[in-house]
Amino acid sequence: ESIVFKNSQLGRNILGDAERLQEYTTENALRFVANNYSTDRILFFSVGNIPFKKVMRLAEKYFGDVAAKYSTKKREKSALYVPDHVRKNLNTHQTHALIGARAYSLSDERRLPLYLLNNILGGPGMNSKLNLAVREKRGLAYTVESAYTAYSDDGLINIYFGTEHDDTEKCLHVIYKELKNLREREMP
């Protein structure tokens, strides 16, 4: 996210960084809650064998006096995506690689076929195209998977793999070949 959504809210670490955490005060926290938490963003869940009327009584008891407040705050639109390449040398015996790009938002109708395509490409099954091509057929990676996340106004699709350092380029070659096949061949 920090690369694909560089210089936007989606690209920021939700945990913060050491410098910002040192500067964070109670006043900052209260201001954040006031600016970001409103009644139009509240979801209430009840799980278990509790009668609906009892749940409603409890909700009314604890939330009935909460004044209605509607947020006008909108997330900043992400900047134009500029492809980038970041390499970090960590003193490990493996390469952990992540390939990502912007994708369709929750409101885009093309997200549904992309969810399906993501499952075919590198979804949770052992029979995904990437798992079969990279791991099972060639034994190049410990793990390989893809993920698609749709946000309200943007999206992210990525492919992750873990491999020996010497096999990184081979993995990339096979992954790019599978992506090309998906793009150029008709699906059965």
What are these regions (language model features)?
Residues 79-81:
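Self-splicing inteins and homing endonuclease
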Residues 1-71, 77, 87, 92, ...:
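Charge-rich, well-structured scaffold segments of protease-associated domains
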Residues 110:
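Acidic/histidine-rich
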Residues 113, 131:
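Phosphate-proximal small/polar/acidic motifs at interfaces that engage nucleotide phosphates
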Residues 84:
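Flexible, small-/acidic-enriched active-site or ligand-binding loops
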